[in-house]
């Protein structure tokens, strides 16, 4: 193969071939990533199923946490779950329940966050401590070790006496 010969400018034998993939792997860490993040819900007979539609990579792990605060007239109970983003760009959580039963009438504070420990393919997009993340769902805080950024969405889920559910 003469057709496969490298151009003369690249014939420096001191550059190992395996530096090319390493460069390509680290390249995305400097690119800002504008996050799209949309929450949807099926009411599911008082056991709401919450899902997130996002452009974050497959395998991104989200955590959902919900509580019915006593000072809002609630039970003080709640729960949490994690879900991974599917190839279709959706993370779906298990139904939100009160110890397996339909949620009793009360307001519930619901928070959805990305968790700190993410797969390698996700970390390469988010960047170290989430530094690449941009968009209106990005929260940031300096914990004393530098700025950290993550995705966060909070909302109030109101379960009414008639079993209907409203989102505030």
Regions found by a protein language model. Name each.
Residues 43-49:
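Short coil/turn motif common to extracellular beta-sandwich-like domains
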């Amino acid at each position: 193969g003469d057709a496969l010969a490298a151009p003369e400018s690249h014939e420096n034998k001191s550059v190992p071939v395996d530096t090319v993939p390493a460069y390509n792997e680290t390249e995305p860490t400097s690119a800002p990533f504008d996050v799209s993040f949309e929450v949807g819900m099926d009411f599911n007979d008082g056991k709401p199923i919450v899902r997130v539609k996002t452009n974050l990579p497959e395998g991104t792990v989200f955590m959902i946490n919900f509580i019915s605060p006593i000072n809002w007239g609630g039970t003080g109970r709640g729960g949490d779950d994690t879900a991974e983003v599917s190839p279709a760009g959706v993370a779906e959580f298990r139904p939100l329940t009160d110890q397996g039963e339909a949620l009793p009438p009360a307001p519930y504070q619901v928070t959805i966050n990305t968790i700190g420990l993410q797969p390698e393919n996700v970390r390469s997009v988010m960047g170290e401590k989430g530094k690449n993340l941009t968009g209106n769902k990005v929260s940031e805080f300096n914990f004393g070790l530098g700025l950290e950024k993550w995705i966060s969405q909070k909302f109030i889920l109101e379960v009414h006496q008639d079993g209907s559910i409203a989102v505030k």
